[in-house]
Each structure stands twice: as C-alpha cells, then as structure tokens.
Amino acid sequence: MSRRRRANKRVITPDSKYNSVLLARFINVIMRSGERSIAEKIVYGALSKAENRIGESAMSVFSSALNNVMPQMEVRSRRIGGVTYQVPVEVKEDRSVSLALRWISKAAATARKRSNKMYMDCLCNELLEAYNKRGGAYKIREEKYKMAEANKAFSHFRFN
C-alpha cells in the first residue's frame, strides 16, 4: 500500500472571454513554454473562425466537438499469469475530457505539419471536423473503440 497521499486537484480559473473552465483547460493544452497570451490568441481566433463558418456560437461548437471526441471506453494493459491482456475499461469523465482536448490539439498539430497553413486555421478545421464527427481526433477515438471492442473477451479481468 502506498504511503503517499493522493494529489489535490488544482482549481483552474475560467478563461477571460467565454468564462469557461473547459476552454481554459484547452488553452493550457495548447500553451507551449508558458506563452498563455499566444495560446489564447490561437484558440480564440480558431473559435471565432469556426463561429463565422457555421453560424452557431463558439462555445456550442466547442462543447459539441468535445462531446463527439470524448471516449467512453479505452483499453488498459493488465498482466495476468505471464500474459499481458488489453482489458477494456470505462473512462472517467475527467480523463475523458483531458484525452479529447489532447487529441484535438494533436490532430491539429499533425495537420499543421502536413500543410503550410497556420496552426489557428488547422485548429479551426479540426474543431469543425470533430463537430461533424469526422477528422483526426474523431478517428483516434474510433480506433480506441475498435481496440476495446476487439478485446471485449478480456473484460472480466477488470481492475479493482
């Protein structure tokens, strides 16, 4: 049994423009080297472009894109009797949100490397793709689901 105590959750202050904790977390994911103002400029720019393209509010586009990418199941490695099994487990909501934010950022960064577009444009495109249940982040989620479905037989090895 571990002697260390459980780490306290940090309280994240909502972002200044939309007053949303989720958006503040997304800005933290996008942020590199502590450059918060640059990360805010990128995220707010991408959201305003998405808002102009679709015609819905920026927060509704962001929240529905996030909900479409959030995973419900994932696989975890569990070693039993010298054999490692990929055991499907349900994802807690906090981890699910964190994964979705990371996947959207990662998909936009991958698109940025492939094209000569600015990161803001790639992030806008990725948010719109996730909103429409397509794109790189949604594809990552579907791959995770396929892995969980393929290893459904090992679900009785759940973690305690």
From Swiss-Prot:
Record flagged with keyword Ribonucleoprotein: yes
Keyword Ribonucleoprotein: yes
GO MF assignments: rRNA binding; structural constituent of ribosome; tRNA binding
GO cellular component: small ribosomal subunit
Keywords: Ribonucleoprotein, Ribosomal protein, RNA-binding, rRNA-binding, tRNA-binding
Domain of life where this protein originates: Bacteria
Regions that span the bilayer: none
Intrachain disulfide bonds: none
GO BP, one annotated term: translation
InterPro entries reported in the protein's UniProt record: Ribosomal_uS7, Ribosomal_uS7_bac/org-type, Ribosomal_uS7_dom, Ribosomal_uS7_dom_sf
Family: Belongs to the universal ribosomal protein uS7 family.
Oligomeric form and interacting partners: Part of the 30S ribosomal subunit. Contacts proteins S9 and S11.
Matching HAMAP family: Ribosomal_uS7_B
Function: One of the primary rRNA binding proteins, it binds directly to 16S rRNA where it nucleates assembly of the head domain of the 30S subunit. Is located at the subunit interface close to the decoding center, probably blocks exit of the E-site tRNA.
Full protein name: Small ribosomal subunit protein uS7
Organism (species): Ehrlichia ruminantium (strain Welgevonden)
Gene that encodes it: rpsG
